[in-house]
Regions:
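Short polar catalytic/cofactor-binding loops
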Residues: 10-15
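Cys-nucleophile CN-hydrolase/nitrilase-fold catalytic domain and related Cys-dependent amidase chemistry
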Residues: 17, 25-106, 112, 183-201
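Residue-level structural signal for beta-strand termini and adjacent loop
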Residues: 54, 60, 114-115, 156-157, ...
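Short beta-strand scaffold segments in enzyme catalytic cores
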Residues: 84-86, 99-102, 142-144, 225-227, ...
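Active-site catalytic loop in hydrolytic enzyme cores
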Residues: 91-171, 184-188, 193, 259-263
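A conserved C-terminal secondary-structure "cap"
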Residues: 252-273
Length: 273
């Protein structure tokens, strides 16, 4: 299988959709200039609102979202595969979907994925999140054929549910994408170890573009976009600033890792009495 170059675009998005689109497009171009064939942006690419209600007010139905034509156009112009980590897509009067879009080099939407696991937590820092108040969770996992490998899609909080990734791996995925907006608190504690664990458990590459730094709405996200090898090695990492990081992805390394430690073959259903 052919080696390809993947990029994570790290953003510090605000509640200004058009400003965020421009910032994302600039970094997608930078990623392509670094040789990327596949570029991924983070969760909430075009909208980091102060709360779910504000995000709902600023969201669009898919057919009206100004980001999609812009991202489809740049994918075609640069001849890249582009994963738009997620957009807030209005699906009813009071709900959005947290939806990823995979766009092919002809500017066509190749796949969609709605984040399954919603972030409803109370953190020791006092931060409180109730994503389910304004977001409808998805119920379908997605695996897509790229020219180089099968890609398994996920978003942010999905990372804490290892069975999703095992199911994606069993469906043939050897590369996982995890576009995220981890909080500074949870990111510092868990980001690196969770991404490395998902890679090691499944012998898969993990491509995890992140939101990073202090946002205009007061929220602080962790940044540190990562690309992790199937052996759990960090092969590219961002800081907390907007940036693009790249790494070469050799799908043969996934097969080698799975041959060394064949846990996918050894995985068994267990009956608990």
């Amino acid at each position: 299988m052919t080696v390809f170059r993947a990029a994570c675009v790290q953003l510090r998005s605000s509640d200004d959709v058009h400003e965020n689109i421009r910032a994302a497009l600039d970094l997608v171009r930078l990623a392509r200039s670094l040789g990327a064939d596949f570029v991924a942006t983070p969760e909430n690419t075009t909208l980091m609102a102060p709360d779910g209600g504000a995000k709902l007010e600023r969201s669009f139905e898919e057919k009206d979202d100004p980001a999609l034509p812009a991202f489809c156009s740049i994918a075609e112009e640069l001849r890249i595969w582009l994963l738009v980590g997620s957009l807030a897509i209005k699906v009813s009067a009071d709900k959005t979907a947290n939806r990823s879009f995979l766009i092919d080099p002809k500017g066509r939407i190749s796949a969609r994925y709605d984040k399954i696991h919603l972030f409803d937590v109370d953190l020791p820092s006092g931060e409180r999140y109730r994503e389910s108040n304004t977001v409808v969770g998805g119920d379908v996992a997605t695996v897509v054929d790229l020219p180089w490998a099968k890609l398994g899609l996920s978003v942010c909080y999905d990372l804490r549910f290892p069975q999703l990734y095992r199911d994606l791996a069993k469906a043939g995925a050897s590369v996982f994408t995890v576009p995220s907006a981890f909080t500074e608190t949870t990111g510092r504690a868990h980001w690196h170890v969770l991404l490395r664990a998902r890679a090691i458990e499944n012998g898969a590459f993990v491509i995890a573009p992140a939101q990073g730094g202090p946002h205009k709405n007061g929220r602080r996200t962790y940044g540190h976009s990562l690309i992790v090898s199937p052996w759990g090695e960090i092969i590219a990492e961002g800081s907390t600033e907007p940036c693009a990081i790249v790494a070469d992805i050799d799908p043969n390394l996934s097969a080698e890792a799975r041959a060394r430690v064949p846990s996918l073959q050894h995985d068994r259903a267990i009956l608990i009495r």
